[in-house]
From Swiss-Prot:
Signal peptide per UniProt: 1-22
Source species of the chain: Arabidopsis thaliana
Lipidation (GPI-anchor amidated serine): S120
Protein's recorded name: Non-specific lipid transfer protein GPI-anchored 30
Record-level Gene Ontology MF annotations: lipid binding
UniProt xrefs under Gene3D superfamilies: Plant lipid-transfer and hydrophobic proteins (1.10.110.10)
């Protein structure tokens, strides 16, 4: 029961942060983040990967690899570090769930035969999604900090 309240509170805070930022959120990025929410404790320093994290992560790897590309970008990595997320642990997460992810594929996807307008649109979407990931990381860190104070 207590765990359910924590997750409910977590989602309420995320929605408030997203609404207050005025940013555009597309369905794909929200879906991706919702699927990876069970991994947040691990990304905030818990050394054991929760079992409930691996299946959603495997689904994202197979069905939405662009999500992982956004999360391993230099911009997201530096912002995640500032928010207290161990980026090395985040990068090791797929392997700890028994999955292999090739980060070179992210470069191949981004350099595919797209036009300049496609690229500029992609850059705008990537910025928006990176901003959302940073907001998520900060919200998770604040919640974790508040939980430690209350406990």
């Amino acid at each position: 029961m207590m765990m359910g309240m924590k997750f409910f509170s977590f989602y309420v805070v995320l929605l408030l942060v997203a609404a207050s930022s005025g940013m555009r959120i597309n369905g794909q990025s929200v879906s991706c983040l919702n699927q990876l929410a069970p991994c947040l404790n691990y990304l905030n320093g818990t050394k054991e990967v929760p079992q409930v994290c691996c299946n959603p992560l495997k689904s994202v790897i197979r069905n939405n690899p662009e999500c992982l590309c956004r999360m391993i970008s230099n911009r997201w990595s530096s912002q995640a570090e500032r928010a207290g997320i161990d980026v090395n642990d985040a990068q090791m997460l797929p392997a700890r769930c028994g999955e292999h992810v090739n980060p070179i594929a992210c470069l191949t996807r981004s350099r595919g035969g797209s036009t300049n307008s496609d690229r500029s649109s992609s850059i705008g979407n990537t910025f928006s999604q990176s901003y959302w990931m940073t907001t998520l990381a900060i919200a998770a860190t604040v919640l974790s900090y508040c939980h430690h104070i209350i406990s």
